[in-house]
């Protein structure tokens, strides 16, 4: 399998004027990642996706109905904000992953399509609006995720807890998975809050191997993220823990297997592995497209070392068919 860089490049990019960070203003592309330690030089070359990566794009009435409902209640879905390739499929099945605490992130991760900037104040009505939307859509399993909110004293944990509690009040039989940020510098207070309102699945993505953290997750720490997963499991031993990795940004398969072993050593139960697809030429470049056989090999290895559930395939994403993942069904 070739390791040729097929989109963009990493280097010390020439300096250009950068927009100021102002409250409520979204920064994307170069304006978002320009201050990152590893620079990205944009390219107009568009890599050809292999045959095994096929995404059906559609805009059915059910998709538009969900979008309109989210707009009406001032809610966001990570499906749209992060340009997920599975948006049409999930929306068409009447499911969505909700993104709380706004649509502006305090981090500058170059793989992510969510905007960076100085976020607005939290919407105190969001937990109720979220619960109402879930009830109106008659959902049985939801994923609640968020932007990073390093500006908040609890990292947003209290808002997560309110959303969990309010959603269960409106939908008593609802299953809730949370995909949380790393609560950098605020782990103790965040865990104290979340153990009082635990979800049904606790998910925090490592995203990549530690060697690539500087370029892919500036501001994050590999050991910290592992510790967050371990400590939540200690606080709520009956709640499954979950993490995910994106492949194709320069990692080696043996490095991925080491991360998998690290996750198991920190009592993580579930794992997702998917192909990274760059949202634009200004994002982290795709180094290679990982073959489905390699995803299958990693899934088999995951079960060998004790994961209870592994979803591994080119279009797998952390919240893709999360209900089926939680039920132990095979996802690829």
Swiss-Prot record:
Query: Where in the cell is the protein located?
Result: Cytoplasm
The alphabetized UniProt keywords are:
4Fe-4S, Cytoplasm, Iron, Iron-sulfur, Metal-binding, S-adenosyl-L-methionine, Transferase
Q: CDD domains from the xrefs?
A: Radical_SAM
Q: How is the cofactor bound?
A: Binds 2 [4Fe-4S] clusters per subunit. One cluster is coordinated with 3 cysteines and an exchangeable S-adenosyl-L-methionine.
Checking InterPro entries in the record gives:
Aldolase_TIM, Elp3/MiaA/NifB-like_rSAM, LIAS_N, Lipoyl_synth, rSAM
- Give its E.C. classification number: 2.8.1.8
Entry keyword Cytoplasm: yes
One GO location term (cellular component): cytoplasm
Q: Which family does it belong to?
A: Belongs to the radical SAM superfamily. Lipoyl synthase family.
- Binding residues for [4Fe-4S] cluster 1: 79, 84, 90, 319
Associated pathway: Protein modification; protein lipoylation via endogenous pathway; protein N(6)-(lipoyl)lysine from octanoyl-[acyl-carrier-protein]: step 2/2
Protein name, per record? Lipoyl synthase
Gene name tied to this protein: lipA
Q: Which residues form the Radical SAM core domain?
A: 91-308
Q: Which GO terms describe its molecular function?
A: 4 iron, 4 sulfur cluster binding; lipoate synthase activity; metal ion binding
* Positions contributing to [4Fe-4S] cluster 2 binding: 105, 109, 112
* Reactions the enzyme catalyzes: [[Fe-S] cluster scaffold protein carrying a second [4Fe-4S](2+) cluster] + N(6)-octanoyl-L-lysyl-[protein] + 2 oxidized [2Fe-2S]-[ferredoxin] + 2 S-adenosyl-L-methionine + 4 H(+) = [[Fe-S] cluster scaffold protein] + N(6)-[(R)-dihydrolipoyl]-L-lysyl-[protein] + 4 Fe(3+) + 2 hydrogen sulfide + 2 5'-deoxyadenosine + 2 L-methionine + 2 reduced [2Fe-2S]-[ferredoxin]
Q: Which cofactor does it need?
A: [4Fe-4S] cluster
Matching Pfam families? LIAS_N, Radical_SAM
């Amino acid at each position: 399998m070739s390791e040729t860089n097929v989109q963009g490049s990493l280097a010390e990019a020439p300096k250009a004027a950068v927009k100021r960070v102002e409250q409520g203003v979204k920064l994307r592309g170069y304006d978002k990642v320009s201050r990152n330690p590893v620079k990205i030089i944009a390219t107009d070359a568009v890599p050809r996706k292999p045959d095994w990566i096929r995404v059906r794009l559609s805009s059915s009435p059910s998709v538009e109905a969900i979008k309109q409902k989210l707009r009406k209640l001032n809610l966001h879905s990570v499906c749209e904000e992060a340009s997920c390739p599975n948006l049409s499929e999930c929306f068409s099945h009447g499911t969505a992953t909700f993104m709380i605490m706004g649509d502006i992130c305090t981090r500058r991760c170059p793989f992510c399509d969510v905007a960076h900037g100085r976020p607005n104040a939290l919407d105190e009505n969001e937990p109720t609006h979220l619960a109402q939307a879930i009830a109106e859509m008659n959902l049985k399993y939801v994923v609640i995720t968020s932007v990073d909110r390093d500006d908040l004293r609890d990292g947003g944990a209290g808002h997560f807890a309110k959303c969990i509690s309010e959603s269960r009040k409106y939908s008593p039989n609802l299953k809730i998975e949370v995909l949380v940020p790393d609560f950098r510098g605020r782990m103790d207070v965040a865990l104290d809050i979340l153990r009082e309102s635990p979800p049904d699945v606790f998910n925090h993505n490592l995203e990549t191997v530690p060697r690539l953290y500087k370029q892919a997750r500036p501001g994050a720490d590999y050991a910290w993220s592992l510790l967050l997963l371990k400590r939540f499991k200690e606080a709520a031993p009956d709640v499954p823990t979950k993490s995910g990795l994106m492949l194709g940004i320069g990692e080696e398969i043996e490095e991925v297997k080491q991360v998998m072993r690290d996750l198991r050593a920190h009592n993580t139960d579930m794992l997702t592995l998917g192909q990274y697809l760059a949202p634009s030429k200004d994002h982290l470049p795709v180094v290679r497209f990982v073959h489905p056989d390699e995803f299958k090999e990693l899934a088999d290895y995951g079960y060998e070392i004790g994961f209870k559930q592994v979803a591994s395939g080119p279009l797998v994403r952390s919240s893709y068919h999360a209900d089926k993942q939680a039920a132990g069904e095979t996802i690829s």
